[in-house]
Structures are given as C-alpha cells and as structure tokens.
Amino acid sequence: MTSPSPTARRTRLRRRTALALAAAATAALTLSACGTDTKANTPATRAGSGNAAAAKADTVALLDDTTLAVPGDKPSALFFFSVGCGECAGGAKSLDKAAQAFDKAGKKANFLAVDMDPNESKQTIMQFLDYIKAPALPATIDKGAALSQRYQVAALSTLIVVAPQGKVTYRATDPSADQIQDALKKAGA
C-alpha cells in the first residue's frame, strides 16, 4: 500500500482549511442575522439612541393600506423582523400578545411589526403573520430603512418602545409580552 504523495496531502489540507473557514464564516453570518441578546437593555443605557429627530412623527403605510403616525399621541411598540428570521417569530408573537392584552384592558398604545427586508412582499408578510397566529397585528415594510435608521436598529428581533414625545424608552431583543406591556406603561400608556 502506498501513502499519498506530499502534493495530494497539501491539496487535502488546503481543501479542509477552506471548508473550515467557509463553515466558520457561515456560522458567524447565521448567528449575526438574528439578535441573540435576551436581556433588555436598560433605558438609561440605550434610551438616548435614535432620538435626534424624535420630535417629528413619521406617517407609516401599513399592509392593510391604512397609516400610523410614529411616534403618535400614545406610546408605540415597534418590533423589527424579517420573515426569514426564525427567531423573529417568537418576538412577533409576544408583540401580538401584548397588543391583545392592552386592547382587552382598554389601554392605549400603538403596536407595529416592522419588516426590515424591503424585498419581502406584502403577501409573504401576511402569510408569516397568519403562520404565527397574529393576522391582525399591524405591519409595515421599512422601505428605505427609514424607521430602522431613525431609531438606530441594526439587528433583527429588536423591539423598541417610543414615547409620544419621540424618545426611545426601551430597547430589547425578543422581550416577552409582559416586558413589552411594562415598557409601554413606563412610557405613558
């Protein structure tokens, strides 16, 4: 039996190294695609971000062809997602549960799911909302990244609460429905 030539060994070593590097790069990109921080950032450390142009409201076109002013006359909870982000389904469900609880209790706040991928169609987003059993959740496509830039949101699965004055009072990754409700109450709901 003959052993492989030195050239064949080097070729195999290069191929293995290239595959390992490709796997590491793929893993890094996959992990960074969805936020993984499950702790809420304290308002004191993050509330100041995204407030430079906070006094002026943006009118957002919703998927149901209505509009919503953000910030409006009541606190707003905005959840940034993409249909392709598996982790985002849980955060969107939490947003919908918080919206239903507020509605049932007669409390006033705006709830908005913001799709960060401008290439996803209205139909795809509606199917996603149906899939997570939140078909009534108000949603929009962040065309031109207007909302994500204004509020400095770079990661999927990020939820922010914006007070009526325009100040971001809460920022977290995939918070629970209770955490969203508490943050909205602190913002004046």
Curated annotation (Swiss-Prot):
The keyword tRNA processing does not apply. It is found in: Secreted. GO terms for cellular component: extracellular region. The keyword Coiled coil does not apply. Residues 38-189 form the Thioredoxin domain. Its main location: secreted. Predicted to be exported by the Tat system. The position of the signal peptide cleavage has not been experimentally proven. It comes from the Bacteria. Keywords: Mercuric resistance, Mercury, Secreted, Signal. Residues 1-27 form the signal peptide. Gene3D superfamilies: Glutaredoxin. GO terms for biological process: response to mercury ion. Probable mercury binding protein. This is Mercury resistance operon ORF3.
